[in-house]
């Protein structure tokens, strides 16, 4: 029996990963991290979506220490989300160490459950400027987990080389485009569905959806060539 862990936020990307994983594994478990994020309601959305889609279980893990250490517009209500890059070249929504911590803990959880894969929705194509979303980072931490736990584990990144339009196409391929559009939370300001329409995350999501809806056949063909 095959088992996978999905690092799950209840957003577009992780929900699309969950939808796909449910067709590929016998048991799919979700893990969500509570780090005092700006839109904390994502935890409730993640619980609801994981149940509705049929995950075997959903674990919420308290990692509040990350909030104390990582100063970001996603961990501090008094720091507005900015469209401009900081002096270091990163967006102010970058949470230092977030995916290092998340993937490490998900790997430990996979060890506990005997899962062979951890699935995460990070993506390098529509690069948001987050260094911990890069393919080389994921491969590096994957190797460290295998060495550190002396057990085979694969961190899978099904969206890594997809653009946002192709991610929408992937949801549509499984008949879940409307579900993802209406029930997921990607917005930095906590607005479910199409979002606030103003934050960088909403811009990326909307532009991708528009690109897919305007060019369904070629986008789907591009997606199929990458699967």
From Swiss-Prot:
It comes from Aliivibrio fischeri (strain ATCC 700601 / ES114) (Vibrio fischeri). GO terms for biological process: queuosine biosynthetic process. Keywords: ATP-binding, Ligase, Metal-binding, Nucleotide-binding, Queuosine biosynthesis, Zinc. This is 7-cyano-7-deazaguanine synthase. It comes from the Bacteria. Belongs to the QueC family. Its cofactor is Zn(2+). Signal peptide: none annotated. The gene is queC. ATP binds at residues 8-18.
